């Protein structure tokens, strides 16, 4: 099973926007979280209070707001609790910007994937195009730089590589090659 924790932050962002909740209004954010149920229809189909949101959460308006939402301590604590519960209940690969450093600091295997900004931007542009959003490469690159800056400098659980993680540069690797490389490393240990 694969758990994309970034999707969880995107779902919360979508829900807050849908309810017109200002993220600076922490009382309203907390009220929203209290009535929030995140579940999965299938491994990669995330739901918020029973509504399937797999494609809506990948769109530009969510992407441009998710870093600000994920910087909120209340949101992080709420989602980390869910992530730890799921991670302890099932065998899974968990993907996220603070999994190895905060959520599961004692995980058996930790990989930190990197890639050249131009390659990451093109991958994201192609992903957005599949969702019907045709942004310029410069727009995508600017969005990624902004998100990286916000996520790396946030007060709670900033994006950072844990010292005991294995860094893999995926710039010149396909998804299958990345998986193959990770499996080889796991089998060696």
Pin down the residues of each PLM region.
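N-terminal phosphate/diphosphate-binding loop that engages ATP/GTP or pyrophosphate donors
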Residues: 1-58
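Conserved beta-strand scaffold positions in the cores of enzyme catalytic domains, especially
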Residues: 2, 110-112, 165-168
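Charged, alpha-helix-enriched surfaces in structured cytosolic catalytic cores
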Residues: 3, 7, 24, 28, ...
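Residue-level signal for inorganic ion chemistry
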Residues: 6, 50, 79, 93, ...
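Small-molecule kinase domains that catalyze NTP-dependent phosphoryl transfer to phosphate-bearing small molecules
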Residues: 32, 43-44, 83-90, 97, ...
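ATP-dependent NMP and nucleoside kinases share a basic, alpha-helical "lid"
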Residues: 54-66, 70-131
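C-terminal alpha-helix
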Residues: 181-189
């Amino acid at each position: 099973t694969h758990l994309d924790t970034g999707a969880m932050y995107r779902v919360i962002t979508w829900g807050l926007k849908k309810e017109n909740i200002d993220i600076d209004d922490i009382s309203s954010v907390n009220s929203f979280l209290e009535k929030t149920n995140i579940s999965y229809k299938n491994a990669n189909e995330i739901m918020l209070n029973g509504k399937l949101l797999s494609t809506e959460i990948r769109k530009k308006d969510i992407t441009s707001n998710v870093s600000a939402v994920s910087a909120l301590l209340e949101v992080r604590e709420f989602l980390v609790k869910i992530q730890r519960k799921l991670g302890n209940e099932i065998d899974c690969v968990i993907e996220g910007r603070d999994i190895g450093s905060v959520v599961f600091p004692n995980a058996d295997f930790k990989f930190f994937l990197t890639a050249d900004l131009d390659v990451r931007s093109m991958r994201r542009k192609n992903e957005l195009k599949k969702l019907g959003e045709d942004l310029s490469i410069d727009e995508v690159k600017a969005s990624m730089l902004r998100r990286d800056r916000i996520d790396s400098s946030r007060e709670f659980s900033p994006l950072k590589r844990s010292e005991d993680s294995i860094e893999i540069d995926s710039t010149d690797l396909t998804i299958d090659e990345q998986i193959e490389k990770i499996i080889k490393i796991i089998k060696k240990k």
